[in-house]
């Protein structure tokens, strides 16, 4: 009888171990499938006049998680609005777009940019005048640089604008 209890406990322990192994294995496979469907989060940084005016066209796009206003491209670390407004810091008012590249492409974002700026006006945008309002594309990697250049070239060849495209393509620095 004592042996029956020992066998019973051994079988019970083996069954419990198998149960934990099965549960652990299925939760691992869930992790793997989750990681393959995780969003591919990236950043795009554009300047095109007043940053508050640049936010709305991008904020409601599918795949865009947030749009942040800020400054880029200048000499001074952490400038404030008044300093940038003087034009003395060489910063540009810009937006940083956080997006899921599996839901929206960088090219799609470039198309939205071109539709919302005057790419031929290198000294400001619309009523916003001064170098702090100049249009620019700030690339974060070689792919973005290449896509931005191709997109700008395509726009130039389209002859949509009489004047030369003045939008610069610049390596992104601290935002």
Predicted regions located by residue number:
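Flexible coil/turn and secondary-structure edge motifs
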Residues: 2-175
